[in-house]
Amino acid sequence: MAAKVEPFWIRKTLDQLDTQEWESLCDGCGLCCLQKLEDEEDNSVYYTRIACKLLDLKTCQCSDYANRRASVPDCIQLTPGQADEFKWLPPTCGYRLVSEGKDLPLWHHLVCGDRTAVHHERISQSGRMLSEKNVAEDDWEDYLIFRAG
């Protein structure tokens, strides 16, 4: 009987992942591309339903991923070196889970082989987001959906 081979996200640390493995940890939920607000009193971070202007509201994919930082200078670029800062990411995020030494959920495309499972399981905000192009920044507080952490 052949030995079981552990998936790369179990047997490697974040620093050991190659670019393709790193990028594949993204489940495509789009939550990191939602606008967030920080409470000035306790520094809590709150997610809103307001999506980056480049995010496709249905597929939860960036419409210009390769060049996103040119049009959105404050776009978040996750790297393995930031793992200790991943607490603001949703608890379902592949990057956060692997950084915490946890396995990926059953609906993650690397586990189930289906990139649309994140939408079928309603982990993503597909169909529930609004583009930042259509909501005044002063109104973002009206669209809070959850607290990070």
Swiss-Prot record:
Report the family membership. Belongs to the UPF0260 family.
Disulfide bonds listed in the record = none
| Name this protein carries in UniProt | UPF0260 protein PSPTO_3918
Name its species: Pseudomonas syringae pv. tomato (strain ATCC BAA-871 / DC3000)
NCBIfam families linked: PRK05170.1-5, PRK05170.1-6, PRK05170.2-5
